[in-house]
């Protein structure tokens, strides 16, 4: 009997504490539900493409050939541009990277509706196969040649040989410059034979091998030609020794002088 009374007393003593815990748990649950609802509403609002579309473009970089209009045009080809939350940056970057003059594109989103684009352009080093351009690494790109400012050497070669031809021009042109000449065109044909056209119009046939020796042979011959060099059409150096010299016809030379 005493035990029963004691137990009942304990229950009576604890009941306010139990109620307090129950109220606290209920309040905490309500707060969680409110926070969850608010978070869900916020995320849904941020992902709603009608509310926060990426609609502004900021273009940065030292640019001479790429404009904001170029970037807008390639982005307009996408099915759609999402929101700050939903848009995949890689998709934007791949699209902008397709612009012919763009060497590298770095893109990030800025809250709430802005796309920031930083571009690095290719730097022209040479013309390639009459319809493309090369950068300093021998990378081929297809920028609009008509927009290129300045004079550049014309390089030609089979697919995949651009770095090799560019290196050859860099190696040999300084040697010609010592005689006051410059390489205007450098050609590596399909048979892997080399041809040089100088800025004074002389064409050099060098063949496939012994380029250093054949070019050195040309230098000796050119010094011997003196003033007669302007009468030379081509020099064929594809021999073990010596060279074959092709001369302009006398009539053609006379016509050129009259034109001057």
Swiss-Prot record:
Where can this protein be found? Cell inner membrane
One Gene Ontology term, aspect cellular component = plasma membrane
**Which Pfam family, any one of them, does this sequence belong to?**
POTRA_1
Gene3D superfamilies on file: Cell division protein FtsQ/DivIB, membrane protein fhac
Ranges where the POTRA domain occurs = 52-122
Residue ranges in the Cytoplasmic topological domain are 1-26
Q: What topology does it adopt in the membrane?
A: Single-pass type II membrane protein
Entry's Gene Ontology BP terms: division septum assembly; FtsZ-dependent cytokinesis
Q: Which residues lie on this side of the membrane: Periplasmic?
A: 48-260
> Disulphide bridges in this chain?
none
PROSITE patterns hit by this protein: POTRA
Keyword Cytoplasm (UniProt): no
Keyword Signal listed? The answer is: no
Bilayer-crossing residues are 27-47
- Keywords, in A-Z order: Cell cycle, Cell division, Cell inner membrane, Cell membrane, Membrane, Transmembrane, Transmembrane helix
Subunit and interaction comment: Part of a complex composed of FtsB, FtsL and FtsQ.
To which protein family does this belong? Belongs to the FtsQ/DivIB family. FtsQ subfamily.
Q: What is the protein's known function? A: Essential cell division protein. May link together the upstream cell division proteins, which are predominantly cytoplasmic, with the downstream cell division proteins, which are predominantly periplasmic. May control correct divisome assembly.
The cross-references to HAMAP family, in alphabetical order and at most eight, read: FtsQ_subfam
Q: What is this protein called?
A: Cell division protein FtsQ
Q: Which organism is it from?
A: Vibrio cholerae serotype O1 (strain ATCC 39315 / El Tor Inaba N16961)
What gene is this protein a product of? Answer: ftsQ
């Amino acid at each position: 009997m005493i035990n029963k009374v004691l137990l009942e007393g304990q229950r009576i003593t604890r009941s306010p504490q139990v109620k307090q815990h129950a109220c606290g748990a209920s309040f905490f649950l309500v707060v969680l539900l409110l926070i969850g609802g608010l978070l869900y509403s916020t995320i849904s609002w941020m992902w709603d493409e009608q509310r926060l579309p990426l609609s502004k473009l900021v273009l940065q970089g030292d640019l001479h050939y790429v404009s904001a209009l170029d970037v807008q045009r390639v982005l307009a080809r996408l099915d759609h541009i999402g929101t700050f939350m939903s848009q995949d940056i890689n998709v934007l970057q791949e699209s902008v990277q397709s612009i012919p003059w763009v060497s590298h594109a770095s893109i990030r989103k800025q809250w709430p509706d802005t796309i920031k684009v930083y571009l690095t352009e290719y730097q022209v080093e040479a013309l390639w196969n009459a319809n493309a351009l090369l950068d300093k690494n021998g990378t081929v790109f297809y920028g609009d040649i008509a927009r290129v400012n300045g004079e550049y050497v014309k390089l030609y070669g089979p697919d995949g040989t651009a770095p090799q031809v560019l290196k050859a021009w860099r190696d040999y042109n300084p040697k010609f410059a010592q005689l006051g000449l410059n390489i205007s065109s450098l050609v590596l044909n399909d048979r892997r034979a080399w041809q040089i056209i100088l800025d004074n119009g002389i064409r050099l046939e060098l063949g496939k091998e012994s380029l250093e020796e054949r070019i050195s042979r040309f230098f000796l011959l050119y010094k011997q030609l003196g003033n007669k060099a302007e009468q030379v059409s081509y020099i064929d150096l594809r021999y073990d020794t010596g060279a074959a010299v092709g001369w302009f016809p006398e009539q053609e030379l006379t016509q050129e002088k009259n034109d001057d």
